Swiss-Prot record:
Localization: Cell membrane
GO cellular component terms given for this protein: plasma membrane
Sequence similarity: Belongs to the PceB family.
Domain of life of the organism encoding this protein: Bacteria
Name under which the protein is recorded: Probable tetrachloroethene reductive dehalogenase membrane anchor protein
Topology of the protein relative to the lipid bilayer: Multi-pass membrane protein
Sequence intervals crossing the membrane: 3-23, 35-55, 66-86
Entry keyword set: Cell membrane, Membrane, Transmembrane, Transmembrane helix
Primary location class: membrane
Conditions for induction: Coexpressed with pceA.
Function: May act as a membrane anchor for the tetrachloroethene reductive dehalogenase PceA.
Length: 105
């Protein structure tokens, strides 16, 4: 392992931190920074970074089919919690119906 490999792994770690911070800021800005949404966002972030790490390590080992498999499997897995987090964060609040004083026929 040379210095370039170490720098790439460090860059992946910093990218994971920056993405997680962005998820936290996004959810906090929406006013929906709850624990389940944070966990769901973390899982999306984890699988995305894991797919990138899998792709890089497979490329450095010259396993080109494993790169595609990692992107499809782990990248596709990252889409599920990412979509759930996005949909729940942008879900409008329920409108409360105003009860009327009179009964309509």
């Amino acid at each position: 392992m040379n210095i370039y490999d170490v720098l790439i792994w460090m860059a992946l770690g910093m990218t994971a931190l920056l993405i997680q911070y962005g998820i936290w800021r996004y959810l906090k800005g929406k006013g929906k920074d709850t624990i389940p949404l944070q966990i769901c966002g973390f899982l999306a972030n984890f699988f995305f970074i894991f797919a990138l790490a899998w792709g890089y390590s497979s490329f450095s080992e010259r396993e080109y089919q494993a790169i595609g498999m990692g992107f499809i499997f782990f990248g596709g897995t990252a889409l599920i919690p990412a979509i759930i987090t996005y949909r729940l964060a942008n879900h409008p609040a329920k409108k409360i119906r105003e009860s009327s004083d009179s009964i309509s026929a």
